[in-house]
């Protein structure tokens, strides 16, 4: 990775950034506070363009969400990405059509929100009016000589209590019950204006609470009718708007393209916000792969700019982004590495070393020709038809590679959906014994498979130790390399020779070196405690790591047994059709469980047992300005 610094003309900034984005190899970083003298007079650009790009991207996403709601697209698990030429993708006509459609859809969507708000408000008002529908008095009350109160009182406020109140006011008060429920009486109280205050005070003493109908005139029934008519009009308008939005379903492809264009523009504006400049020039700093420097310089030849590239200093390593360089075989493993953590800059890319182990181990655990065929077919069909990119593309590429390994290991163990063919032949032709040729049987050769699993684990552990040895030697940590790796190799060789009956001399030498290591490397009392700590940690660590690889045998055995059990159950009716249906259902469940289970266990072996020996994590992902798209395949 190279550090890039570029000084260019402000008038060419937009075109230059588009050229960089088209190359997809430059990550623009924020200008730090160093070299203030150089940067004096430079300022950050305003964020108006960034906010506009964010708004445009949000508008297209909102429009697409509305289409998904009112004009849902029939689609399966995966959406096919339509191929679009760059000329058509970036054309002004395409953008204008999509913008007009998005504005129309979003305007209608906002109106739907307003309609929903009005509907909720009107329904709440109708609920408030419901207890008063039998009352003919106007809700606005009365003025002058007559005072009118709408209100509620508890059920404990009886007619006798109200009659007593009316008597105390010389009969200048009367009331009418509009309705009641389980806890309240809804009362209309009328009195002469001269006793209004006395009546209201006495009513409150009884627990009477007034109800206000602000802004309403006429009776409750009249207002309820008006609200019902308004709700009907709103419902009609809502249906018309939804139909209008649904009628724009044909604009979906244009909106998908526009959403991708907006995302590309937004990435460019975010990068632009990290620049500094004046009204004449701008300054850009960032990172690009070393092998793209010449191509970048050639691309920028038409522009008036000065470019400087240099190797990063060791102090800059934590800030240097990491880009994994892989071929077709190792690229799918990016998703595994990124799920764990990218390697720190300046350290080793683990993918080429991990790929053969990951793919082989997955095949060992799955070990079935039928399952392998399904994985390969799914990988090819999805990759060709839907052209997934990014992590999804890596996932299906890895699925295909693991499918090949699964098929090969299945051929070695004679598994095709378990013993599907054996059981099928027995049903079709009773008395006929048929079995696929196999090198070994998971059920009969358990000991051999167990030893083989641990042997493969030992190979991967030693590989990790060898990588660690090389890296330590590069950093001139020769003592660490000798006592951490070479010493234990001597121990491993000694154990192997002892098991073969060749004596224990080499093992004794290895053990002596294990005890000597902490003494040579430790200080003070640490020499003594280090002997026991190192011995315990390494012995238990290596022993536990090697035992972890027995999961290769366990998952191979589990998958094989489950498949055979389902086939056995399916064969019980003795009917070919019933056998095929039951067997396929059982194998489908077994396949689904093993597909995920083998991945998880394989991932654990790589991340905990293998990476633990040499891997230095903490890398910062390389995020250049790109033309990555979500919905279309840019060609």
Predicted regions mapped to residue ranges:
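Conserved, carboxylate-rich catalytic/transport cores that coordinate ions
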Residues: 1-2, 9-17, 21-28, 294-635
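Long, charged N-terminal accessory/stalk domains
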Residues: 1-354, 382, 389-392, 396
């Amino acid at each position: 990775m190279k550090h890039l610094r570029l000084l260019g003309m402000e008038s060419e900034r937009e075109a230059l950034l588009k050229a960089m984005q088209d190359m997809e190899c430059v990550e623009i970083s924020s200008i730090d506070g160093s070299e203030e003298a150089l940067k004096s007079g430079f300022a950050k650009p305003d964020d108006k363009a960034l906010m506009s790009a964010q708004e445009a991207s949000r508008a297209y996403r909102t429009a697409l969400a509305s289409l998904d709601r009112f004009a849902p697209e029939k689609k399966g698990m995966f959406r096919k990405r339509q191929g679009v030429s760059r000329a058509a993708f970036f054309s002004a006509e395409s953008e204008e059509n999509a913008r007009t459609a998005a504005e129309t859809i979003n305007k209608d969507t906002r109106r739907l929100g307003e309609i929903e708000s009005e509907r909720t408000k009107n329904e709440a008002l109708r609920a408030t009016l419901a207890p008063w529908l039998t009352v003919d008095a106007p809700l606005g009350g009365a003025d002058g000589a007559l005072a009118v109160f709408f209100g509620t009182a508890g059920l404990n406020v009886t007619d006798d209590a109200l009659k007593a109140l009316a008597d105390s006011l010389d009969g200048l008060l009367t009331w009418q019950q509009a309705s009641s429920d389980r806890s309240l009486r809804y009362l209309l109280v009328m009195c002469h204006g001269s006793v209004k205050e006395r009546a209201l005070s006495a009513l409150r003493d009884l627990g009477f609470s007034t109800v206000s109908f602000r802004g309403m005139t006429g009776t409750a029934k009249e207002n309820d009718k008006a609200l019902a008519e308004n709700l009907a009009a709103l419902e009609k308008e809502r249906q018309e708007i939804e139909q209008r939005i649904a009628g724009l379903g044909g604009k979906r492809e244009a909106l998908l393209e526009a959403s991708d264009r907006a995302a590309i523009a937004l990435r460019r504006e975010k990068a632009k916000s990290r620049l500094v400049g004046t009204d004449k020039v701008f300054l850009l700093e960032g990172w690009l792969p070393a092998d793209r420097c010449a191509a970048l310089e050639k691309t920028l030849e038409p522009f008036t700019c000065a470019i400087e590239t240099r190797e990063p200093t060791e102090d800059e390593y934590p800030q240097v982004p990491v880009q994994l360089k892989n071929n077709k075989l190792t690229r799918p493993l990016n998703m595994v590495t990124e799920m764990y953590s990218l390697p720190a800059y300046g350290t080793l890319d683990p993918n080429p070393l991990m790929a053969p182990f990951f793919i082989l181990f997955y095949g060992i655990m799955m070990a079935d020709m039928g399952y392998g065929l399904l994985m390969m077919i799914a990988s090819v069909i999805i990759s060709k038809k839907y052209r997934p990119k990014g992590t999804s593309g890596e996932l299906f590429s890895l699925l295909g590679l693991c499918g090949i390994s699964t098929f090969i290991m299945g051929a070695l163990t004679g598994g095709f959906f378990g013993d599907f063919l054996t059981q099928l032949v027995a049903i079709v032709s009773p008395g006929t014994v048929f079995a696929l040729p196999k090198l070994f049987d998971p059920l009969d050769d358990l000991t051999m498979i167990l030893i083989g699993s641990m042997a493969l684990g030992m190979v991967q552990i030693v590989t990790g130790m060898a990588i660690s040895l090389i890296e330590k030697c590069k950093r001139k940590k020769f003592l660490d390399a000798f006592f951490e790796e070479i010493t234990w190799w001597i121990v491993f060789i000694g154990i192997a020779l002892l098991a073969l009956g060749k004596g224990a001399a080499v093992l004794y030498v290895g053990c002596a070196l294990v005890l000597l290591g902490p003494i040579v490397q430790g200080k003070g009392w640490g020499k003594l405690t280090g002997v026991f700590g190192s011995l315990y940690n390494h012995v238990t660590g290596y022993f536990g790591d090697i035992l972890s690889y027995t999961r290769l045998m366990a998952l191979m055995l589990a998958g094989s047994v489950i498949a055979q059990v389902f086939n056995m159950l399916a064969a019980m009716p003795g009917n070919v059709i019933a056998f095929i249906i039951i067997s396929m259902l059982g194998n489908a469940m077994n396949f689904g469980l093993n597909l995920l289970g083998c991945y998880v266990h394989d991932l654990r072996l790589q991340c905990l047992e293998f990476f633990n020996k040499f891997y230095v994590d903490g890398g910062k992902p390389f995020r250049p300005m790109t033309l990555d798209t979500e919905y279309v395949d840019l060609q």
